[in-house]
């Protein structure tokens, strides 16, 4: 019998959640995603030293201002790592916008355009890149603007139904609801152990998937942040799942039959009126888990962005 990975590929697109090219070569995913934490980790790998040198040289050629050089080097490095990954996958790479911009729509739009231009300068068309944005109200609005310019977006750090609904209504290409981090929060709060069928993260993605399909939204649902293979099997049939290399490797040993769980039965319901900003903010605030995990996620990415920039600054 085929392993979990091979069975899952029959009805779900598998995406590698890593910046490590060697891991990508090994698991052969369709797409790949990166974020500041993964880029920081990747930047310590010896095979990336030439890319760091190239990013530094690029930054020095663009500006004499140290702060601008640091920003340019970080952006260039993200794109260089993305370029390297694209050599080994047939699909798209997700490259994240600086999390410090998460509450500034205009700044996120400008950064998204800049990243796409850096890819274009390297001969990579925008249809192979997803710009990752935090699913704040401002991030969702930035995604809406970029999508209208033909720049596809991946709205990440998504923990609530309000975020998912606003993303669909904005017409973004893809969302990344975080399964494992939702589970983490509930386990910490309740002290309970959850099965894959009672896992709050799994149930959240199932609800979002069903809502999108029955209302005819085209936004792709890509489950993310998995803690175990049970969460993955419980979401078999989801549009896409982005999985870390270690979980993908574990899936190699799974030899049981994998049934499809999520099924698209077509649009059957009329779409509601668009969610207003006031409604979004209230609904998000009512969800303590989503409020805490979104804030925590942004802070975590900012910490790693700062660490990456500090390491780059030492080389400038």
Swiss-Prot record:
Pfam families: TAL_FSA
Pathway: Carbohydrate degradation; pentose phosphate pathway; D-glyceraldehyde 3-phosphate and beta-D-fructose 6-phosphate from D-ribose 5-phosphate and D-xylulose 5-phosphate (non-oxidative stage): step 2/3
Any GO BP annotation: carbohydrate metabolic process
Gene source species: Methylomonas aminofaciens
Catalytic site: 132
GO cellular component terms attached to this protein's record: cytosol
Localization annotation: Cytoplasm
Protein name: Transaldolase
Broad EC category: transferase
Highest taxon of the lineage: Bacteria
UniProt KW keywords: Cytoplasm, Pentose shunt, Schiff base, Transferase
Cited HAMAP family: Transaldolase_1
Catalytic activity annotation: D-sedoheptulose 7-phosphate + D-glyceraldehyde 3-phosphate = D-erythrose 4-phosphate + beta-D-fructose 6-phosphate
EC numbers, comma separated: 2.2.1.2
Reported function: Transaldolase is important for the balance of metabolites in the pentose-phosphate pathway.
Record-stated family: Belongs to the transaldolase family. Type 1 subfamily.
GO MF assignments: transaldolase activity
